[in-house]
């Protein structure tokens, strides 16, 4: 008798497993879509010296999640920034054609119409808009005319404020490094315990510093409140116009012409012909323009590899004696103490990369950065060319930019040896260029929600059907086994 009962256990277990599985499959659920195709977005970063195009991509059903938007491709527009075409605005639009044609190839044809296309102009256009608003409008109109000829979903060309540029760069860096939220190994969205990191951007016409702070701002214009993924962030940000790489070089050139008649930041043995109109036509150098000014005059200027005089020239760029607040960075601008980790990108990265890779010098501390800068500034033109044969573009300017970066960080932003150790100089994060462009697109396409994304589990339809068949087979197999056991028990030879 006991043997008969034991023989019924396997089919009964199979039947129980099958019935349990069927019951679970019949529990009301929500439909889950199949893995979606990718969606795309395009941002044209119209900087002061050049324009760059970035194509981003993300899964089409993840519009309110994170950690999923990445860079698909990029393209550098040939020629100068769009503000350089003020005298012939049509060329501003024409300059974008090569990169837009690349975008047509990079984005699948069936996604063209649904791909948002943005153009954001930064510090190069801000002063231009103040001095020549009509010319600015003509340039933006010409650019818009070109962009609307393409099958993308063009959503406008606008001039970003300095605050926008700083905040969007901060959002980009922290988004890519998953400092807001990340998908954990437990299969759900979690908020990382690490805090956000500050962002420092050195463009062609301006520089930005942005970081989260607990200190209330004494200047409301430098404080931004953000709500991302259910978390509130108080962010300090400031953009210094005319403190970008290209404008700093122009201002130093104007000072060298006025004070020395030689350039202490240029390497000895390097000389060039300087057209005065090109020096003083910028809004950033108008204040240095001599009264007796002949724009068509050409002046010959030579370098002297003098680190000491170069430092003195750069120090004139910073006014640290006047501060109407309890604490300032420079030029009377309020700034709370820097705190936490920072990422420095754009010209910050390229300059420090030159010091470490080409010059072979360490820059892990402020003191090392100062020493590396001084060594670079004391190099002759022949010595510099020997390090990078065939490269002459920008080679003579690394001393001046490195000197500016050191003084900006130490005297301007007040980094000390301890806080400087928390600064990393980086070009990309998660294979995506760090800059304001991604943060700008994330904001305009609502890809970052204000509240934490919810979690929903589901099963693909094909998997559901397979499980249904499996559990049905289990029940049928159990029934067959039960029938065989019953027949076996009823047979005349059964004990």
Swiss-Prot record:
Topological domain ranges for the Cytoplasmic compartment: 1-4, 484-495
Cofactor entry: Ca(2+); Mg(2+)
Active-site residues (renumbered): 165
Disulfide pattern: 75-99, 242-284, 265-310, 323-328, 377-399
Extracellular side: 26-462
Electron transport recorded as keyword: no
Keyword hit for Transmembrane helix: yes
Induction data: By FSH in Sertoli cells but not in peritubular cells; by cAMP in both type of cells.
Pfam families: GDA1_CD39 (PF01150)
InterPro entries on file: GDA1_CD39_NTPase
Tissue specificity field: Expressed in brain, heart, vas deferens, kidney, skeletal muscle, thymus, lung and spleen. Weak expression in liver.
Example of a GO biological process term: purine ribonucleoside diphosphate catabolic process
Sugar-modified residues: 64, 129, 294, 306, 319, 378, 443
GO molecular function, one term: identical protein binding
Binding positions for ATP per the UniProt entry: 204-208
Keywords recorded for this protein, A-Z: ATP-binding, Calcium, Cell membrane, Disulfide bond, Glycoprotein, Hydrolase, Magnesium, Membrane, Nucleotide-binding, Transmembrane, Transmembrane helix
The EC number(s) this enzyme carries: 3.6.1.-
Membrane-traversing stretches: 5-25, 463-483
GO cellular component, one term: plasma membrane
Listed PANTHER family: ADENOSINE/GUANOSINE DIPHOSPHATASE, ECTONUCLEOSIDE TRIPHOSPHATE DIPHOSPHOHYDROLASE 2
Annotated function: In the nervous system, could hydrolyze ATP and other nucleotides to regulate purinergic neurotransmission. Hydrolyzes ADP only to a marginal extent.
Similarity field: Belongs to the GDA1/CD39 NTPase family.
Listed name of the protein: Ectonucleoside triphosphate diphosphohydrolase 2
Organismal lineage: Eukaryota, Metazoa, Chordata, Craniata, Vertebrata
Gene: Entpd2
